[in-house]
A protein has these predicted regions:
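Alpha/beta-hydrolase fold catalytic core
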Residues: 222-271, 277-278, 282
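Loop/turn elements at helix/coil->beta-strand transitions in domains of secreted/extracellular proteins
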Residues: 14-18, 42-47, 183-186, 270-276
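Short beta-strand immediately N-terminal to the catalytic nucleophile in serine-hydrolase-like folds
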Residues: 20-23, 51
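Short glycine-enriched nucleophile-adjacent loop
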Residues: 27-40
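Mobile gating loops/cap/lid regions near enzyme active sites that modulate substrate access
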Residues: 258-261, 265-440
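C-terminal, loop-rich substrate-recognition/catalytic regions characterized by aromatic stacking residues
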Residues: 182-226, 366, 429-440
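Gly/Ser-rich "nucleophile elbow"/oxyanion-hole loop immediately N-terminal to the catalytic nucleophile
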Residues: 5-21
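Substrate-access "cap/lid" subdomains that shape
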Residues: 6, 42, 47, 51-211, ...
Length: 440
């Protein structure tokens, strides 16, 4: 960011109008910058978009970071910081290590931990909405199909034009940062409903009994463990064919969905109820038919070709009607069985993305992000913007969380446990069982 401030003008950019956006660990890095001491003194950016931020439960302190650095330097066979600074970048990348923000008493501002205590009064039990049932996020029931489809090579589909932004009803033209303190930058924040599919392979190794044992070990409290097990309908007797889906839901909420809501609530409180725009991304990915982690990036960058199934034409639909049926009762049923379906049974579990719904989500997402980068409010900040499913877009009442995210389960199971313990639950379950343990 310092480089941008020093050099972006030479490329036609404006160092006084920088917008950050990041997904996953990149989103978490943005939050760390927002909570940094330097951001209070000299902000290096002016607004940010945080998409499905993924945190580690505990940031390293100086001692643990020092031990980690010693191991890295030892593997590189360097003994001083001066020699370490001269190591080629390729060698550092080859180590595969990542070391992010450190709680050293310098980087973060005073009281930054309060962002992760979630002491906000929740608004989910508003009058008139007690009857709404909590639903499961779109797509987690179709994880078997998720494994079977690989992404094609990156590249723009020739059959699609560039993303010409459609003329959408624009929100009020108030500058998104005009009424805020400089270090309280305007913020767009949200998540995908099936972010936990990012860890689906290690999660698939869990058994029901192993999950129960691990939760008891993490929570160190029978009552708190029982709250989680009851909320997510997990027990030692959960059938093998169901345990993966339920752990995916728990990990999704613990690692991404609930932390996203905590951050949104705290940021809005700090900004006096203004300058924070919440969204939910429930649109199916164009290839896997599920709103998986980074599905929003595929629409935002528009650089993954659509599958052929997205370009079905009206004439193809008409071909299903060939006139009146004329089938003899004596004809063998097996003669028509091979023509009844062109797809595997698993494909019925996912939603195909057609060209229209893809373009609608893509254009709306790009338009809102660009409007925000230009200093406009992307939508009303007292509303939630929805992307999907099936091409749905628009502002919605915040009561939609009762149907699109498991907010009441968070209140029951997560809030008594606390942010760090919930993060630890999510991290440990997302890594799968240890080799030879928790598998029986």
């Amino acid at each position: 960011m310092e480089w941008l401030h020093n050099h972006i003008s030479e490329f036609g950019g404006d160092p006084s109008n920088i917008t950050l956006f990041g997904a996953g660990s990149g989103g978490a890095d943005i939050v760390c910058h927002l909570l940094s001491r330097s951001n209070e003194v000299k902000p290096l950016f002016h607004r940010a978009v945080v998409q499905s931020a993924v945190f580690e439960p505990i940031l390293p302190d100086i001692a643990s970071a020092g031990r980690y650095l010693s191991r890295v330097m030892s593997s590189l066979q360097v003994s001083t910081i001066e020699k370490f600074r001269r190591v080629e970048v390729d060698k550092l990348i080859g180590l595969g290590h990542t070391l992010r923000a450190i709680d050293d008493g310098v980087f973060f501002r005073s009281g930054w931990q309060s962002y992760f205590t979630h002491e906000i009064q929740q608004q989910t039990h508003q009058k008139g909405h007690h009857h709404i049932e909590v639903s499961r996020p779109v797509g987690l029931g179709a994880v078997s199909n998720y494994f079977s489809t690989l992404l094609p090579p990156l590249g723009r589909s020739k059959s699609r034009s560039k993303s010409a932004l459609r003329s959408l009803p624009s929100p009020s033209k108030t500058a998104s940062g005009s009424e805020l303190i400089p270090h309280l930058q305007p913020l767009i924040i949200g998540d995908c409903s099936s972010d936990s599919l990012l860890w689906s392979i290690p999660i698939s190794l869990w058994t029901a009994a192993g999950v129960v044992r691990r939760l008891k070990a993490i929570c160190q409290s029978l009552s708190k463990t029982s709250r989680i097990l009851r909320a997510y309908d997990i027990s030692s007797y959960t059938p093998d064919e169901e345990i993966m889906e339920r752990v995916l839901e728990l990990v999704n909420d613990a690692r991404v969905a609930w932390p996203t809501q905590c951050l949104s609530d705290m940021a809005k409180q700090e900004r006096g109820g203004k300058g924070v725009w919440r969204y939910v991304f429930d649109q199916e990915g164009p290839w896997r038919g599920l709103p998986h982690h980074a599905a929003d990036l595929m629409y935002l960058f528009d650089n993954v070709p659509l599958p052929a199934s997205a370009f079905a034409t009206a004439t193809e639909c008409d071909s299903f009607y060939d006139g009146p049926f004329d089938v003899s009762d004596d004809e063998d049923d097996s003669t028509c069985s091979s023509h009844t379906s062109r797809t595997d049974d698993d494909e019925w579990l996912t939603t195909a993305v057609d060209e229209y719904s893809y373009a609608r989500i893509r254009d709306t997402l790009q338009d809102r992000w660009i409007s925000f980068a230009n200093g406009d409010a992307p939508w009303r900040d007292d509303k939630v913007f929805v992307f999907g499913p099936e091409g749905e877009t628009g502002e919605r009442s915040k009561d939609i969380f009762d149907g699109r995210r498991r907010q009441r389960m968070w209140q029951e199971a997560f809030e008594p446990l606390g942010f760090q313990h919930v993060q630890k639950v999510g991290v440990e379950l997302s890594r799968g069982p240890a080799l030879g343990a928790d598998r029986m």
